[in-house]
Amino acid sequence: MSPKVNRYSEKIILAPMVRINTLPMRLLALEYGADLVYSEEIVDHKLIKCRRIINEKLGTVDFFDTEDKVAFQTCSAEKDKVILQIGTADPGRALKAAKLFEQDVSGIDVNMGCPKGFSLKGGMGAALLTNPELVYEILSTLTNNLSVPVTCKIRCLPSLEKTLELVKIIQSTGVSAVAVHGRTKDERTQHKNRNDYIREISRYLTIPVIANGGSGEINCYEDIEKFRRETEASSVMIARSPESNCSIFRKDGLLPLEEVIVDYLKYSIKCDSGLHNVKYCVQRMMGSYQATTRGQACIRANSVRDICNLYNLADYYDSFYEDSNPDRFLDNL
């Protein structure tokens, strides 16, 4: 098995989630035991306009978009673990985007499963499922011109036969693995995941298959292995479970939610994350607890420090910005 293929074999992976999978959450997942972490999907149009800046104050590499906002941030602690997911419908543009980030990530993934209107209208995401010629062009262009592994994440087609035809084409492009969400583009979380489809795909292909879509039945670490066995996949990718409690990756069991939020906030401080992203992630973790006094205070928070103060981290936040604090650099993780 080649090193590129082996990278995706027998792994537990943090699935790409919009607004969730920024650097703090990826680092938290790795700390708790995830083997690989995906970025949120970023569209190629945005990526090709980014400026790469080495942030010596934080020990990060920051990619700024045309509005001077950080579109992607990474650091040495995740260098061999982070996969950049690209939204694209054009081989040339996909390659141009991937080349800009190639030196800073462990792999490139093409989103071929997003069912949202924005992706479909742009010919991206799940729209690619019924355009196998373009799928071949995009993936072949990337595998033939990048030094890092290339993968894609798909959804099932309505019939197993059509799905197998598609993954055969995907494998022929030289990709290192394929992640399969066991639902069609028209199905949602209330629909049963097609574990039988993933199982047949796993038997059909020679490259690693990454099973996805089973988070609704994954409530503890042992459930991850149960999902892998049921699908006979090489690896498992989970989303909703770690979104609620990222310590799902711990072999030793789940941590109390408050402890997880504290750990997340510490990484957010070290990454100098913005209020909107931090608040969004904390609220997603809190779930129904947003109705509590602390939850309502989080909603009203006007700064990251305000949120930190709710978890007795105000002093930690303040000390981070002291020049004498050696722990302020992510290189010291």
What are these regions (language model features)?
Residues 62-150, 155-171:
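Active-site beta->alpha loop and helix N-cap motifs at the rims of alpha/beta catalytic domains
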Residues 56, 80, 117-135, 183-195, ...:
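Glycine-rich tight-turn/loop motif centered on a GG-T
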Residues 39, 107-115, 172-183, 235-242:
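Non-cysteine beta-strand/loop elements that form the S-adenosyl-L-methionine
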Residues 2-6, 17-100:
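Glycine-rich, positively charged N-terminal anion/phosphate-binding segment
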Residues 17-19, 42-44, 87-89, 113-115, ...:
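Active-site beta-loop-alpha junctions enriched in small/polar residues
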Residues 1-18, 23-24, 31, 137-147, ...:
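Alpha/beta catalytic cores of nucleotide-metabolism and tRNA/nucleoside-modifying enzymes
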